[in-house]
């Protein structure tokens, strides 16, 4: 192994875990108290986190097991799909995941600028004013050049950013714990009381449905270490970092959701404007708490944005190394950063940023679509684990036995399907249209390969035809108004 190859494999467990935490915890956590209290009492909130934690554990464990038994698959999410189900499925998962994170990063730009409006009103209001577009565009290229300086250097900055992100979260937890009163927490625990100030929240099942729409998306980013597995010092670090990041984030989410119920009543929390953590601390400790949370929001979003800039450039780079994306994406600079992938990705982000200026409503729709587009990657990974567990090639030795892998894969598939269903049919059909846009790029990449027959085998053609027909069906349903956008 050359020194240049070694230099690219320099991410340890802490750096990878930092990537996971920073990828998962973004600006949304600062609105979590209000988001949860808007539809549920404390009892239903507890149940929703138990159910979500149970389901996401199997997704996290899927990545842990796969990184342990197949450490040779160093391109993570994309390669699991390709290895298990062929080049076209692998490409489609990689393409959809790439688009998802590109638009997700532009979402971070919008959130950052909107958060700045707290300090500089009204210049950045909504995140789509001209100053906001200029500011967001500048940050897109700042992060581009940070990552160009090297993945390791960017990861160190990300770890530092994650630490500074967690500090205001810890302060919020400490302060809400200090003001916590059990009597307040137990008041209308199941959300059934009816008063003028506090209407009934309905049955526990209806409350669960409302909170699950929040918690279902809370762990998007859990695959952060897997995507970067090709740059890990030790393949075992990938699984360790994924589990550590998952448990850490679950703990933070539970505390953030429940402690405010002991400081303020449910109807008070439900009516606090977002970011609601700022409103909670403004009530409990005064203006300085509100300022702290708004600063924390900006740091959190910037830290997550840096993480996803690293990850989103790694996706086409990894796919191109295996011949599925165009070869140009494999070019690295002297710092071993995927330079061409970074520039192309940042350029697409820049175009998307300009679109935000003209249509904020369309942008909100796009964010919902991209939330759905990440889920096929989870589904394919869990299905691949299930497939491996049944094969004769599954490792006979080792701590992870085939039955455990099979159970994890099955439950991971079930939970992934539930997430896709919960996302809504409308956004699923929109996502299919975006996935179909990748077909010409797949065909172009396949034609240039010596093993072109593999790219255009019968099942690959069937897959392309199936996705294409679904996309055409979606376009028909949207154009005729049978499904309203």
Swiss-Prot record:
Transmembrane intervals: 12-34, 38-60, 89-111, 126-148, 155-177, 211-230, 243-265, 291-313, 363-385, 400-422, 427-446, 461-483
GO molecular function: antiporter activity
Keywords: Amino-acid transport, Antiport, Cell inner membrane, Cell membrane, Membrane, Transmembrane, Transmembrane helix, Transport, Virulence
InterPro entries: AA/rel_permease1 (IPR002293), Amino_acid_antiprt (IPR004754), APC_superfamily (IPR050367)
GO biological process, one term: amino acid transport
Gene3D superfamilies per the UniProt record, alphabetical: Amino acid/polyamine transporter I
A GO cellular component entry from the record: plasma membrane
Compartments, as annotated in UniProt: Cell inner membrane
Membrane topology type: Multi-pass membrane protein
Family label: Belongs to the amino acid-polyamine-organocation (APC) superfamily. Basic amino acid/polyamine antiporter (APA) (TC 2.A.3.2) family.
Function (record text): Catalyzes the exchange of L-arginine for agmatine. The arginine uptake by the bacterium in the macrophage may be a virulence factor against the host innate immune response.
Further comment found in the protein's record: Inhibited by L-canavanine and D-arginine. Resistant to cadaverine, L-lysine and L-ornithine.
Protein name: Arginine/agmatine antiporter
Biological source species: Chlamydia pneumoniae (Chlamydophila pneumoniae)
């Amino acid at each position: 192994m050359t020194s240049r190859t070694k230099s690219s494999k320099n991410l340890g467990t802490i750096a990878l875990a930092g990537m996971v935490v920073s990828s998962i915890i973004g600006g949304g956590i600062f609105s979590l108290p209000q988001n949860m209290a808007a539809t549920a009492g404390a009892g239903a909130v507890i149940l929703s986190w138990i159910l979500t934690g149970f389901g996401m554990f199997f997704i996290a464990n899927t990545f842990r097991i796969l990184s342990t038994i197949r450490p040779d698959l160093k391109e993570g999410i994309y390669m699991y799909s390709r290895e298990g189900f062929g080049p076209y499925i692998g490409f489609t998962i990689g393409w959809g995941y790439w688009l998802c994170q590109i638009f997700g990063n532009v979402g971070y730009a919008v959130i950052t600028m909107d958060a700045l409006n707290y300090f500089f009103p009204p210049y950045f209001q909504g995140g789509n004013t001209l100053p906001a577009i200029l500011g967001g565009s500048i940050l897109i290229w700042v992060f581009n050049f940070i990552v160009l300086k090297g993945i390791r250097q960017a990861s160190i900055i990300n770890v530092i950013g994650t630490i500074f992100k967690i500090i205001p979260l810890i302060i919020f937890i400490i302060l809400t714990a200090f003001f916590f009163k059990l009597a307040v927490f137990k008041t209308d625990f199941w959300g059934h009381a009816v008063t003028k100030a506090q209407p009934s929240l309905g049955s526990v099942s209806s409350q669960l449905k409302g909170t699950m729409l929040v918690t279902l998306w809370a762990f998007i980013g859990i695959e952060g270490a897997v995507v970067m597995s090709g740059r890990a010092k030790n393949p075992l670090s990938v699984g360790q970092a994924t589990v550590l990041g998952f448990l850490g984030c679950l703990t933070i989410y539970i505390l953030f959701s429940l402690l405010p119920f002991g400081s303020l009543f449910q109807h008070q929390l439900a009516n606090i404007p977002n970011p609601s953590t700022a409103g909670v601390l403004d009530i409990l400790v005064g203006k300085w708490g509100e300022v702290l949370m708004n600063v924390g929001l900006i740091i959190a979003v910037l830290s997550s944005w840096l993480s996803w800039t690293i990850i989103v450039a790694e996706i086409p780079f990894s796919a191109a190394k295996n011949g599925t994306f165009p070869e140009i994406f494999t070019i690295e600079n002297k710092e071993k950063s995927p330079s061409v992938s970074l520039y192309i990705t940042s350029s697409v982000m820049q175009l998307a940023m300009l679109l935000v200026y003209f249509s904020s409503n369309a942008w909100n729709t796009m964010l919902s679509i991209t939330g759905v587009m990440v889920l096929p990657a989870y589904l394919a990974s869990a299905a691949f684990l299930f497939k491996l567990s049944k094969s004769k090639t599954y490792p006979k030795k080792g701590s992870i036995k085939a039955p455990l892998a099979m159970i994890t894969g099955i439950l991971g598939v079930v939970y992934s399907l539930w997430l896709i269903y919960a996302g809504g049919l409308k956004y699923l059909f929109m996502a299919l249209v975006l996935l179909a846009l990748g077909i010409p790029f797949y065909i172009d990449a396949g034609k240039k390969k010596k093993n072109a027959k593999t790219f255009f085998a019968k099942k690959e053609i069937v897959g392309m035809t199936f996705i294409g027909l679904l996309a055409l069906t979606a376009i028909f349903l949207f154009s005729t108004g049978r499904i309203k956008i």
